[in-house]
Each structure stands twice: as structure tokens, then as C-alpha cells.
Amino acid sequence: YGNNEVLEKYDNICREYTVEPKDQSIIPAFLPLYTPVRLGKYTVTALKAYHAPEEKYPYIYLITEGNCTLLYMHDTGRLFDEVYDYLIKNNVKADIISYDCTFGLLKSGGGHLGLDSCALEKDKLFENGISDKNTRHIINHFSHNGGAIYDEIVPIAAEYGFETAYDGMEV
């Protein structure tokens, strides 16, 4: 599921390679912005992201299963006001928020977050009632661009109230 740009890239890749999938495990489908869509046991809402300048319509996701709501903020910089407007208008209460933390301990900017901007978003989400004292805030999506290794990030992230994701982590 994705935006039209993702679907177009997928179609181009499928045409470029002669080997086709033997089954229909991948069926591309458009997911419209700000429209909750039922996908199996999940309700998924695409929200506008800020990623790479050449990407016209990148998405982050709001995913709900039963009474649990995850705000999945990967491959994005700071959230747009229209995302906050949607979350506030729809009275979204996130149980878990997974933050892009590509820049780690370095100053962030552009289409990814670092711990500095994760902390700003965490505060803004709390101030707007989207998160509360029971929300789990988890940083994820690390890279070599972060200026620190995992063991260096964990204690600093904890000071800001973040859990630091690890391979195999289940929430």
C-alpha cells in the first residue's frame, strides 16, 4: 500500500525485470491520505510525511488494531501542521509512537529526525493530547549518519523518555 509514486516505481521495477512473482503475495494498492482503510485486522491511515525533496507524497502511518494505536513516524522529518490537525480533529490517542532517529545524536534536519527533533515532536504530541504518560515512545531507524553507536544512544534517549529499539524487539 502506498501513494501513486510508490505504485509507479513498483510497476517500473516489475517491467524492468523479466522474473515475475510466482504468486500474488504483492498486490500494489493506492492508500489515500487521511482516509482510514481497513487492512485485515488493522485500520491504517496514511499521513503526510516530509522525506526527500524529490518525493511528492511520502507517507507515515497511523495503525490501529483493536484498542491499540501506533503512530509510525519513519522516513520523515518534523510533522506538518496538517498532520497535527488531523490527529487532533480525530481525537487520536497514541499508545505507541515509533520515531525515525536516523540522525541519532547529531543535529537533525530535512527528511529524517534525530534525538533532538524526536524530543521536540514528543513534547508537541503530548501538548496536543495525542500522547500521554502511558504512551510508549520508541526511537528507531538508526543509521551510520547518527554519530553514535547503539550503546551510546540508549542512556541519552532514556533521559528524554525514549525507549531505544533493537533487533527482535516486540511491542
List PLM regions with ranges.
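Fold-independent oxyanion-binding glycine-rich loops
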Residues: 4, 74-76, 101
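A short helix-to-beta-strand connector/capping loop
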Residues: 19-29, 40-42, 93, 133, ...
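Short, acidic Gly/Pro/Ser/Thr-rich loop/turn segments
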Residues: 8, 51-54, 104-106, 145
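Cap/insert and terminal regions of metallo-dependent hydrolase folds
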Residues: 79-169
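Extended hydrophobic secondary-structure segments that form protein cores and membrane-embedded regions
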Residues: 1-3, 27-32, 136-144
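Core dinuclear metal-dependent hydrolase active-site scaffold
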Residues: 28-89, 169-171
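Active-site HxH/HxHxD metal-binding segment of metal-dependent hydrolases
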Residues: 1-29
